[in-house]
UniProtKB/Swiss-Prot annotation:
Biological process per Gene Ontology, one example term: trans-translation
Main location: cytoplasm
Species the sequence originates in: Prochlorococcus marinus (strain NATL2A)
A GO molecular-function annotation: RNA binding
Designated name of the protein: SsrA-binding protein
Similarity comment: family membership: Belongs to the SmpB family.
Region annotation Disordered: where it falls in the sequence: 1-21
Function (record text): Required for rescue of stalled ribosomes mediated by trans-translation. Binds to transfer-messenger RNA (tmRNA), required for stable association of tmRNA with ribosomes. tmRNA and SmpB together mimic tRNA shape, replacing the anticodon stem-loop with SmpB. tmRNA is encoded by the ssrA gene; the 2 termini fold to resemble tRNA(Ala) and it encodes a 'tag peptide', a short internal open reading frame. During trans-translation Ala-aminoacylated tmRNA acts like a tRNA, entering the A-site of stalled ribosomes, displacing the stalled mRNA.
NCBIfam families in the record: PRK05422.1, smpB
Keywords: Cytoplasm, RNA-binding
Entry GO CC: cytosol
C-alpha cells in the first residue's frame, strides 16, 4: 500500500498532516485563547528523542518574554532512557522558543493588557522539525467554564437527537 493510502490514528495526526506529539487540552478549558502562534524550539538531542517518544507534559507550562526572547517554563520532558546520567538533560529546563522579532513584539504588546498570558497549546512534528503552538489566553472564571459546559452539553444533545431521526 502506498504512503497516501495509509491511515493515521485519530489521536496523533491533525488536519494538516502534522504528527501531534503532545497537546494541552486543559489550556482550552482554563483559558479563552485570543490568538495563536507557531514557534520552533531550541532543544538538546536527548530532549528531541524523548519528545519523539511522546514523553512530554505541557499541562503546567507557560511562556515569558525576557530580553526579546520567548522562554518556555514548567514543561516536563522526561529524561531519555538510553542516555547515560551525565549526558541526559534536566527535565524542567527552561527552553527558548524561536519566532520572528515582529511576532515577539506583537506578543509583548498583547501581554501588556491585564490578565493575559502565553500558554503552550500543542507540540507537533512539521516535516522533521518539532513545532510548538502557543496561544495568548485570558483566564476564565468558574461561571464562564460552567456556561461553556452547558452550551457544549446542549450542542451534544441536539446532535444526538438529530442522529436518531
Amino acid at each position: 500500500m502506498s504512503k497516501k493510502g495509509k491511515k493515521q490514528s485519530k489521536n496523533n495526526s491533525s488536519v494538516d498532516g502534522n504528527r501531534r506529539l503532545a497537546e494541552n487540552r486543559q489550556a482550552r478549558y482554563e483559558y479563552e485563547i485570543l490568538e495563536t502562534l507557531e514557534t520552533g524550539l531550541e532543544l538538546l538531542g536527548t530532549e528531541v528523542k524523548s519528545i519523539r517518544a511522546g514523553k512530554v507534559n505541557l499541562k503546567d507550562g507557560f511562556c515569558l518574554i525576557k530580553k526579546d526572547q520567548i522562554q518556555l517554563h514548567n514543561v516536563h520532558i522526561s529524561p531519555h532512557n538510553h542516555a547515560g546520567k551525565f549526558f541526559n538533560h534536566e527535565p524542567l529546563r527552561i527552553k527558548r522558543l524561536l519566532a520572528h522579532r515582529k511576532e515577539i513584539e506583537k506578543l509583548k504588546i498583547s501581554l501588556e493588557r491585564k490578565g493575559l498570558t502565553i500558554i503552550p497549546l500543542s507540540l507537533y512534528l512539521k516535516g522533521s522539525w518539532i513545532k510548538l503552538k502557543i496561544g495568548v489566553g485570558k483566564g476564565r472564571k468558574i461561571h464562564d467554564k460552567r456556561d461553556r459546559e452547558k452550551i457544549n452539553d446542549s450542542k451534544r444533545d441536539v446532535a444526538n437527537a438529530l442522529k436518531r431521526f
